[in-house]
């Protein structure tokens, strides 16, 4: 069993807070998801999440124009600089103050950030002559605003910066001190916070947008004075312009009139003159400036639009809403959605892998069920029929049907081909179901209740209630069917485990006593053992046949449990969450993964009863329970100061409003407290492919995998990738480097030279170390090159080595390799056909050679029989259908891969049989 699992992706959350941004090519969208950053590839339909984590939720992110450096800053002002291509953290830095915005300059030399009421300009880390990576170097600090800065914008020539602030003003700043006279301007006149300020495409105008819906157009014009009439025409023709006589003045004023809705976010695309505005009502509008013509007006819902971004060409607009976790990419010219995703509003309760491991289903407290694609990371479908919290989900064996249980008293069956609810199961009375199990045949579904402690059994075909299994004296916590003999195992809070024979005649069940309440249960895939997690923090393993305990794992010391804000004692002395609430067997039965209401996921080796690896769920200090020690400065006799609700001190009215119902605090907590989400893991499950497992947590759906799917080009940032250096690497027998550099340069003659120069004995080693990003191009090259090449064996060795080393990755990413694999298939078909034709054309020559040898007369008779049989089969070859159709190929004698080949052997009958088997195995 592999134990080298690493974090690979985060599903279930697409946007949390902060700004979103496009890459320079417009193909990728970067979105902050809590304390991580997710990247959505809008062209290739896939996504990934960076492995690094912040200590708090991310407040601002930006990507430089070259697409190589990503900077992200959290709520406390701690920044992380990341190599975007390699996904490696390069530098940590603390700005020691909250940052509301960060932007790279268009030329990439500098980046500016809004730190409180100060504008800081820093030099972008770069590679100097000595090739040493330099840390952050501050270039300039500008002070002038009286309140916090809300946004900043660079000019296209990277000389000036526009900032907006809560002091109802905007300012223009120069990067260099020589031009400070040109930029010493303050834009006043707005009556509310200025949300954005932008340069026009020719930089002759400046647009400022305020929160109350006012748009001012500023132009750099000459000041009116009494001396203007006395100026001569010669003075007007002077080349030198006296800048002191010019100033920025308001030439036009426009208003949105959004029915009391405030402007929440705004962006402007200078090339297309497109202004995109998001409002607190969930509405967003598109305007054409400077005419202020309304182009489109749409809505995302009733929640505020928190951020908006536009790509480089101005065709796509991205909107984010943090209330429901919505992310939207809209193409305004065609009025169509490029991406429309939404995460779970509430915490996730359960997850289930599809039998092929390509999809995963999550169930949430909000009553919704979402189907996620593992490869792309996108949500495929959402089911909203449940009216209460969904407690469990599970697939049928074939993966086309899914079942779910809910606290609304129903168990529903879902068709994942038509995406509809085709069956609803209910009990004789209204009860709540909290666990679910499906028979391997898919004919019976069982659910355990919280109210009457019974296990209800339904027929999937008829939808009728078949039986109610009683015997438990407490709520049924977990159910599981055996995959071999359809035995049902149930666990309960009454400290017992019961093994039920659903299809047997006898329903007498002897309970297996456990020393504590059973919280979770998992049955080994072979159905011989069952593992349970108890309230005492132990995982006990029982043999099903003789009901004896065969193993016990003490997990209390392996669990990482932090201190909560409302705790009066330390985490070390706390009994909170010192147990696992969900466990799952690996498919070989050698390992168990476990999680609970704590900050750890543990992987155990079952035979040796030891901990293999422990994973930290989240390092986000904004979650309750991630810290082992609390800040003593905030601890008082009444509790932690973090519990005090300071929402009434917010500047925005919508943030100060108390949304609690009148009288809802009666009999409860009479003081206003601020509650933070708790870190927890509600469900874990291994993937059927055995190379990954998923965990449903507070942060979302965490995917841990053993596959290194990072597509990093190691030569992308190297300036020495030249044809000369490629030939030099080949001469020094650095075959892998030479091959990758040749594909990096994309010179056909160079690729051919390097490819043919690699020795046959080195091919397996080179093929096993090729970066995954180059696999489609190399396979496509071999498929096209081999058709015209005479090196048949050489090309086949390359194909075998590549498929052996990367077959799993190719199978998981079929959409990337479809073209390349068709080219290779065409080459293999032609080779096989040529071999068969050569054998057929030479069979009479072989017969003549055999007949001249007197010592082989007996064998010749046998050969004649083979030839006669072969000739008889030739008449039937025309009626056989081939799986692969070759273009412009009319030669006879080829019978396809599915045909039976009875051709004459070249040496003896044994070799012939071997060749027949090999030809049948050809794909």
Swiss-Prot record:
The keyword Ribonucleoprotein applies. InterPro entries: Apc4-like_WD40_dom, G-protein_beta_WD-40_rep, PWP2, Quinoprotein_ADH-like_sf, SSU_processome_Utp12, WD40/YVTN_repeat-like_dom_sf, WD40_repeat_CS, WD40_repeat_dom_sf. The modification Phosphoserine is found at residues 225, 232, 651, 664, 912-913. WD repeats lie at residues 12-52, 53-93, 94-132, 144-183, 189-228, 258-297, 300-340, 343-382, 385-424, 428-470, 471-510, 513-552, 575-614, 676-714. It holds the Pfam family Utp12. One of its GO terms (cellular component) is small-subunit processome. The keyword Phosphoprotein applies. GO terms for molecular function: mRNA binding. Keywords: Nucleus, Phosphoprotein, Repeat, Ribonucleoprotein, Ribosome biogenesis, rRNA processing, WD repeat. Residues 869-893, 911-923 have a biased composition (Acidic residues). CDD domains: WD40. It is found in: Nucleus, Nucleolus. Residues 653-674, 869-923 are annotated as: Disordered. GO terms for biological process: endonucleolytic cleavage in 5'-ETS of tricistronic rRNA transcript (SSU-rRNA, 5.8S rRNA, LSU-rRNA); endonucleolytic cleavage in ITS1 to separate SSU-rRNA from 5.8S rRNA and LSU-rRNA from tricistronic rRNA transcript (SSU-rRNA, 5.8S rRNA, LSU-rRNA); endonucleolytic cleavage to generate mature 5'-end of SSU-rRNA from (SSU-rRNA, 5.8S rRNA, LSU-rRNA); establishment of cell polarity; maturation of SSU-rRNA; maturation of SSU-rRNA from tricistronic rRNA transcript (SSU-rRNA, 5.8S rRNA, LSU-rRNA); ribosomal small subunit assembly; septum digestion after cytokinesis. Belongs to the WD repeat PWP2 family. Present with 16700 molecules/cell in log phase SD medium. PANTHER family: PERIODIC TRYPTOPHAN PROTEIN 2 HOMOLOG (PTHR19858:SF0), WD40 REPEAT PROTEIN (PTHR19858). Interacts with snoRNA U3. Interacts with MPP10. Component of the ribosomal small subunit (SSU) processome composed of at least 40 protein subunits and snoRNA U3. Required for bud-site selection and cell separation. Also involved in nucleolar processing of pre-18S ribosomal RNA. This is Periodic tryptophan protein 2. It comes from Saccharomyces cerevisiae (strain ATCC 204508 / S288c).
């Amino acid at each position: 069993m592999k134990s080298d699992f690493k974090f690979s992706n985060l599903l279930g959350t697409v946007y949390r807070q902060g700004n979103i941004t496009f890459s320079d090519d417009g193909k990728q969208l970067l979105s902050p998801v809590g304390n991580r950053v997710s990247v959505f590839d809008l062209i290739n339909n896939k996504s990934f999440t960076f492995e690094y984590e912040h200590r708090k939720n991310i407040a601002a992110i930006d990507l430089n124009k070259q697409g190589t450096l990503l900077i992200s800053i959290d709520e406390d002002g701690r920044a992380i600089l990341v190599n975007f291509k390699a996904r490696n953290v390069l530098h940590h830095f603390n700005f020691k103050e909250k940052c509301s915005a960060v932007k790279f300059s268009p030329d990439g030399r500098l980046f500016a950030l809004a730190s409180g009421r100060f504008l800081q300009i820093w030099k972008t880390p770069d590679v100097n002559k000595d090739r040493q990576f330099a840390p952050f170097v501050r270039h300039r600090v500008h002070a002038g605003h009286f309140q916090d800065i809300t946004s900043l914008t660079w000019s296209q020539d990277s000389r000036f910066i526009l900032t907006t602030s809560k002091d109802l003003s905007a300012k223009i700043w120069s990067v260099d001190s020589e031009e400070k006279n040109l930029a010493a301007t303050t834009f006043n006149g707005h009556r509310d916070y200025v949300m954005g300020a932008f340069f026009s495409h020719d930089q002759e105008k400046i647009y400022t947008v305020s929160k109350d819906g006012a748009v001012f157009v500023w132009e750099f014009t000459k000041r009116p004075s009494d001396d203007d009439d006395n100026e001569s025409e010669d003075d007007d023709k002077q080349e030198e312009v006296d800048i002191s006589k010019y100033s920025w003045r308001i030439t036009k004023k426009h208003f949105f009139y959004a029915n009391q809705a405030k402007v929440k976010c705004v962006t402007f695309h200078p090339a297309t003159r497109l202004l995109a505005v998001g409002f607190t009502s969930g509405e967003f509008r598109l305007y054409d400036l400077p005419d202020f013509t309304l182009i489109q007006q749409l809505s995302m819902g009733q929640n505020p639009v928190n951020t908006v971004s536009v790509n480089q060409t101005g065709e796509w607009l991205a909107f984010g809403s943090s209330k429901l976790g919505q992310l939207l990419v809209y193409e305004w010219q065609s009025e169509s959605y490029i991406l429309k995703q939404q995460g779970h509003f509430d915490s996730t309760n359960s997850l289930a892998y599809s039998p092929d491991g390509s999809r995963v289903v999550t169930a949430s407290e909000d009553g919704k069920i979402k189907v996620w694609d593992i490869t792309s990371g996108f949500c495929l479908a959402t089911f909203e029929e449940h009216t209460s919290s969904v407690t469990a989900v599970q697939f049928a064996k074939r993966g086309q049907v899914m079942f779910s249980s809910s606290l609304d008293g129903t168990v529903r069956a879902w068709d994942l081909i038509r995406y509809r609810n085709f069956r609803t199961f209910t009990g004789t009375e209204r009860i709540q179901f909290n666990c679910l199990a499906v028979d391997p045949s898919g004919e019976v579904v069982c659910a355990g209740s919280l109210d009457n402690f019974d296990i209800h059994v339904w027929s999937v075909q008829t939808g009728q209630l078949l039986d109610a299994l009683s015997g438990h004296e407490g709520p049924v916590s977990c159910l599981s069917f055996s995959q071999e003999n359809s035995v049902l195992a149930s666990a309960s809070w009454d400290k017992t485990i019961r093994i039920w024979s659903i299809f047997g005649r006898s329903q007498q069940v002897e309970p297996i006593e456990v020393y504590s309440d059973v919280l979770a249960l998992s049955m080994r895939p072979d159905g011989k053992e069952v593992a349970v997690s108890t309230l005492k923090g132990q995982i006990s393993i029982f043999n099903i046949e003789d009901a004896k305990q065969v193993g016990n794992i003490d997990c209390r010391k392996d669990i990482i449990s932090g201190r909560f804000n409302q705790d009066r004692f330390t985490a070390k002395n706390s009994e909170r969450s010192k147990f696992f609430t969900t466990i799952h067997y690996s498919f070989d039965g050698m390992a168990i993964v476990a999680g609970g209401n704590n900050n750890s996921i543990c992987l155990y080796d079952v035979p040796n009863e030891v901990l293999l690896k422990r994973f930290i769920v989240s390092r986000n200090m904004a979650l309750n329970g991630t810290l082992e020690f609390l800040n003593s400065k905030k601890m008082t006799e009444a509790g932690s100061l973090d519990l005090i609700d300071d929402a009434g001190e917010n500047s925005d009215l919508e943030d100060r409003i108390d949304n609690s119902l009148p009288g809802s605090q009666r009999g409860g907590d009479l003081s206003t407290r601020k509650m933070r989400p708790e870190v927890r893991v509600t469900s874990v499950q291994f993937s059927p492919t055995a190379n990954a497992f998923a965990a449903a947590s507070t942060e979302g759906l965490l995917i841990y995998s053993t596959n290194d799917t990072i597509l990093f080009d190691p030569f992308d940032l190297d300036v020495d990738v030249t044809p000369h250096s490629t030939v030099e690497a080949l001469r020094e027998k650095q075959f892998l480097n030479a091959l990758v550099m040749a594909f990096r340069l994309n010179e056909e003659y160079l690729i051919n030279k390097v490819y043919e120069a690699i020795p046959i004995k080195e091919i397996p080693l080179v093929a096993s170390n090729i970066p995954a990003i180059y696999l489609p191009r190399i396979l496509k090259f071999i498929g096209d090159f081999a058709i015209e090449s005479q090196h048949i064996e050489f090309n086949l060795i390359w194909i075998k080595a590549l498929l052996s080393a990367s077959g799993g990755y190719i199978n998981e990413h079929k959409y990337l390799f479809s073209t390349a694999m068709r080219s290779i298939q065409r080459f293999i078909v032609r080779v096989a056909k040529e071999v068969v034709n050569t054998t057929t054309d030479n069979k009479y020559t072989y017969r003549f050679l055999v007949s001249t040898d007197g010592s082989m007369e007996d064998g010749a008779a046998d050969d004649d029989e083979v030839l006669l049989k072969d000739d008889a089969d030739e008449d039937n070859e025309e009626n056989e259908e081939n799986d692969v159709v070759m273009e412009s190929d009319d030669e006879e004698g080829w019978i396809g891969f599915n045909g039976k080949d009875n051709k004459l052997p070249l040496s003896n009958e044994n070799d012939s049989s071997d060749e027949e088997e090999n030809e049948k195995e050809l794909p």
